[in-house]
């Protein structure tokens, strides 16, 4: 089986989930081409060495400001989106690595539905949201583009969604799967590598390198509580915060931590839920996907949710509260990549027999 992966975002969660599925398929003998933009690089570190990475940007881009989405600048970027999208589709329809694929898997590049129809190939999407939903949440001025993307998505053969996905009724032919998270190394090994004592509390700051989060780094006084050790997955100008030695092994550090403080990205959420780690989500404005993630988790006691600006004013009070508040820490099943691989083989077999 030749399988083409189209990953629409260079962020942590998208790449990790799709890489887990690609590695599982490769383990079963599939030939994989993984198309993504990978400046971190992350995919190159976690993908099976036999998987070919095709380094190309896959369309959707949100312009960020202070952690949230800059709606006006994003809209300016999207003014010619439909034309750019159709040019991308035309290019893909004539690309050998696309023509040679037996099946397409995406996280969700909604235009993959057009490729599926035009090339008569099955396409599977695995995601917890869609871009057309997110654009509509941002502002009604994105409606034309949202309608276009929704039409593209209708060509998807099957849509696999993990727990706490949003607006499931918008997915074509939806099927539930479990969380997708990498298997971490043992907690005690990582804490020993990081030189964390048994009586110390390891806190991961996983929010990205935006100006707001750099302000958070600077708001922390390491001398206020010598029991706390702070790590981050981002560059930091604060001497109070240590940088994780290997960002592509963030799952190991999350598993070894006592508390994760994040902006509510689904990749970080998946790992805290899979490993049973306490989670403090700091909500930012103009970030619909993360805000919805936070609201869903708060309702089921899987995370504490507070306003990001509150943390700037009283970081240690919120840290103490999140370390002591009642929270559902039972680890959730995280074999969704195995379930996804099963679905992909089943869909291809069914398609081939028609």
Model-derived features: where do they sit?
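A short, glycine/small-residue-rich beta-strand->loop->alpha-helix junction that serves as a flexible
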Residues: 7-19, 213
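C-terminal amphipathic helix plus adjacent low-complexity
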Residues: 317-354
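A nucleotide-sugar donor-handling region in carbohydrate enzymes
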Residues: 134-211
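Conserved nucleotide-sugar donor-interacting segment of glycosyltransferase catalytic cores
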Residues: 93-150
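Conserved nucleotide-sugar phosphate-binding/catalytic loop shared by glycosyltransferases and other
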Residues: 9, 27-28, 32-83
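Donor-nucleotide binding loops and adjacent catalytic segments primarily
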Residues: 22, 182-259
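A donor-sugar binding/catalytic signature common to diverse glycosyltransferases
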Residues: 104-108, 125, 249-292
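Conserved nucleotide-sugar donor-binding subdomain of glycosyltransferases
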Residues: 69-103, 110-111
């Amino acid at each position: 089986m030749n399988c083409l992966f189209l990953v629409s975002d260079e962020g942590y969660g998208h790449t990790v989930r799709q890489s887990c599925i690609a590695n599982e398929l490769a383990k079963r003998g599939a030939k994989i081409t993984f198309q993504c933009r990978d400046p971190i690089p992350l995919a190159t570190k976690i993908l099976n060495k036999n998987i070919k990475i095709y380094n190309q940007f896959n369309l959707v881009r949100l312009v960020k400001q202070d952690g949230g989405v800059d709606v006006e600048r994003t809209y300016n970027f999207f003014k010619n989106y439909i034309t750019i999208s159709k040019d991308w589709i035309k290019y893909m329809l004539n690309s050998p690595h696309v023509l040679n694929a037996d099946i397409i898997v995406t996280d969700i590049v909604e235009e993959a539905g057009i490729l599926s129809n035009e090339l008569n190939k099955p396409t599977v999407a695995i995601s917890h949201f869609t871009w057309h939903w997110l654009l509509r949440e941002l502002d009604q001025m994105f409606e034309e583009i949202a309608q276009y993307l929704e039409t593209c998505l209708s060509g998807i053969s099957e849509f696999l969604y993990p727990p706490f996905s949003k607006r499931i009724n918008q997915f074509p032919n939806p099927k539930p799967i479990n969380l997708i998270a990498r298997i971490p190394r043992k907690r005690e090994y990582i804490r020993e590598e990081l030189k964390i004592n048994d009586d110390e509390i390891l806190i991961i700051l996983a929010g990205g390198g935006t100006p707001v989060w750099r302000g958070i780094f600077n708001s922390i006084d390491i001398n206020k509580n010598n029991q706390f050790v702070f790590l981050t997955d981002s560059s930091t100008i604060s001497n109070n915060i240590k940088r994780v030695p290997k960002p592509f092994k963030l799952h190991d550090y999350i598993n070894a931590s006592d508390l994760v403080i994040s902006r509510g990205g689904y990749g970080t959420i998946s790992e805290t839920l899979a490993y049973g780690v306490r989670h403090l989500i700091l909500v930012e404005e103009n970030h619909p996907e993360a805000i919805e993630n936070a609201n869903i988790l708060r309702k089921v006691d899987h995370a504490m949710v507070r306003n990001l600006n509150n943390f700037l004013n009283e970081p240690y009070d919120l840290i103490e509260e999140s370390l002591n508040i009642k929270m559902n820490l039972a680890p959730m099943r995280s074999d969704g990549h195995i379930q996804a691989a099963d679905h992909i083989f089943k869909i291809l077999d069914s398609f081939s027999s028609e």
